Amino acid sequence: MSVKPIPGILRPCISSVLPKLDGGVNVILDVGANADCKADVLYQFGILGSLFAEHVCGVQTPRVGLLNIGEEESKGNMLTIAAHEMMKDSTDFNFCGNIESRHLFDDECDVIVCDGFSGNVILKQAESVYSLIKQRQIEDDYFDRFNYENYGGTPILGLNNCLLYTSPSPRDSCA
């Protein structure tokens, strides 16, 4: 069987999870498959993320947020403004508006939609903060949930079959 996009899906995306401070996770997508996106692609990420949060993470009526530099509708670049315009009246998912990066680990939403460039930067930053915390020998159950070595892989959503993306850590690579 070949693996290909589900009919109607413009671009599959890599999803990941960010631990919420008070329990649970925020699904974030895309985290690296699509560095450049159009508004309709981000809209589809909202659908895929909402379905994943509901059926895999067990969230009833997931709230979908669009990563942006401000909470106001008029904030952002041309992409996020156009995506917000499409998402705000969605009947395909429960859109809760723009989400600023300071709310990534809050309970403001359950799904965070962004392009793969931004999502990958966020993911790498979370990994970096976890590494700094461990180097400082800070023990905390919440921060232990950021340990990427505990995750075998992360799903690529929008495909007709299950496919996990895995990335070896630099220390596991051949020299």
Give the predicted meaning of each segment.
Residues 38-97:
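Glycine-rich phosphate/diphosphate-binding loop of Rossmann-like nucleotide-binding domains
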Residues 1, 10-12, 38-39, 121-122:
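Short glycine/serine/threonine-rich phosphate/pyrophosphate-binding segments
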Residues 1, 75, 80-143:
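Glycine-rich phosphate-binding loop
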Residues 27-30, 63-68, 115:
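Short beta-strands and strand-loop turn motifs
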Residues 21-35, 153-162:
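A structural-propensity feature for long, helix-poor, extended segments
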Residues 31-35, 71-73, 167:
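Short beta-strand and adjoining strand-loop segment in the mid-core
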Residues 2-32, 90-99, 136-143:
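Short, acidic/small-residue loops that bind anionic groups at enzyme active sites
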Residues 165-172:
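Conserved small/polar residues in nucleotide/adenosyl-binding loops
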